[in-house]
Amino acid sequence: MNIQWILSDKIKRAMIAAGAEQNAEPLVRQSGKPQFGDYQANGIMGAAKKLGLNPREFAQKVLEQVDLSDIAEKTEIAGPGFINIFLNKNWVAQQADTALNTPNFGIKTAHPQTVVIDYSSPNVAKEMHVGHLRSTIIGDAVARALEFMGNHVIRANHVGDWGTQFGMLIAYLEKMENEHADAMQLSDLEAFYRAAKETYDNDEEFAVKARSYVVKLQSGDEYCRTMWKKLVDMTMQQNQRNYERLNVTLTEKDVMGESLYNPMLPAIVEDLKKQGLAVEDDGALVVYLDEFKNKDGDPMGVIVQKKDGGFLYTTTDIAAAKYRYHTLHADRALVFSDTRQSQHMQQAWLITRKAGYVPDSFSLEHHNFGMMLGKDGKPFKTRSGGTVKLADLLDEAVERATLLINEKNTALSEQEKAAVIEAVAIGSVKYADLSKNRTTDYVFDWDNMLSFEGNTAPYMQYAYTRIRSIFNKTDVNPTALSAAHIEIRNDKERALAIKLLQFEEAVQTVAKDGTPHILCNYLYELAGVFSSFYEHCPILNAEEPVKLSRLKLAKLTEKTLKQGLDLLGIKTVEKM
């Protein structure tokens, strides 16, 4: 149930019937203040201006053409030409009943698409650090939202599994195996990488072997490929533990590393040359883009093949876009990476389109995000200034949540307490990030994120358990409850029912724009509206028809909160 879409469709048809152009947009939005209705159509003035008409007169014409009798109890023209729409409470009650009794609340996209989502993308032989958190959890929330709406989602974990460093890493893995080292030493990937680099820098014989392994690996040598695969597998096994702790849906099957595109690169570069897009410059192959200027105001050069024959990230990203369209048959490809990658992605995709590798209808979207900062406003680091490992961050979250929950509640069993601690710990880290507009930097603050007040995971999780507890206190017959209907008798019930019906609008925005904070804001507002309803509308002490109706509103709120948090990858618990 997407009220915004229903109203937009009806008002757009009426605008066209009243003389507006076919592409006129009604710009229907949720109203910010009750006196202006539940929804407003703000596109009337723009359409009237194009027609040379008085906006209020045109608004009147539109209202004469539109039939909202089943949906709205009244409409009014406000200000210079806004249309305010007040929803009919009986229609709202019926829609809320339908949402409660329909799988997925009846939410389903009319036009399912195949969507590739490129997210997380850690490097092989290195441990995941806090810098991987945002891509991993934002990408996953968007993947869940798109899937929930009925799209076919292909997760693409674009891991850094290729490059000259692999000669060094293979040679060091071989050295360790020859020395019969315990495989457990590889549990610390950072130490492994550092030791390999140190050996490479200080042992010329080792360095010669490492360089020879680079060449062998790139030419498909079986031994080097086997050793390389071991490194990839060991890394991804460790990453998988992080994904599982984070309640992220990525698996080893979703790995589509840089190496996947290697076979495509020579042909792409050759084709760019043939088309005259890539030209030789000082031995390298460069594509000059008029759309980007260097500091002298000349077209910017983007290297696609180095002087030594090596390929670059740009070449790989061109290949990835081509692969996602031609091989995966995607309609959209979304990449979740740091804002600092924005120009790089724009250039790679511009070359992709200039070369004709994908049609204009194929949507290539870079969903960029800002940095995670410490309280000092600088990039988040350890006290000694080092990179914070993701596993260490999650461990600290559990330690802090343990102290918090032990202070709050001793009535839980040990098993229940462990579940609450894990849900609150991981949920707090994720929600603190997901609730911020992804395009901005944000300050990582343990005290704020673990608070039971405000727009936080603990507050949302507690709101859910409070509603669950209502059903533990009632002896209402489940058959009687399912047979009952929602009836709206006052403004608090009406406000809650309308807010519940706006769930799809929030999910749809996340799916379209890659903005999970919209869903967080919606859930927080829903919890607030429910709290006000609960305060003013007694449930358990109400008379039977009223009690059943209010219980159904509470049940729909419970389901919506649980589903909404699940789309964010945040666990709920039955008791807190």
UniProtKB/Swiss-Prot annotation:
List GO terms (cellular component aspect).
Answer: cytoplasm
Report the subcellular localization.
Cytoplasm
State whether keyword Protein biosynthesis applies.
yes
Q: What's its EC?
A: 6.1.1.19
- Catalyzed reaction equations: tRNA(Arg) + L-arginine + ATP = L-arginyl-tRNA(Arg) + AMP + diphosphate
Q: Which HAMAP family match?
A: Arg_tRNA_synth
Q: Which family does it belong to?
A: Belongs to the class-I aminoacyl-tRNA synthetase family.
User: What protein does this entry describe?
Assistant: Arginine--tRNA ligase
Q: Which organism is it from?
A: Mannheimia succiniciproducens (strain KCTC 0769BP / MBEL55E)
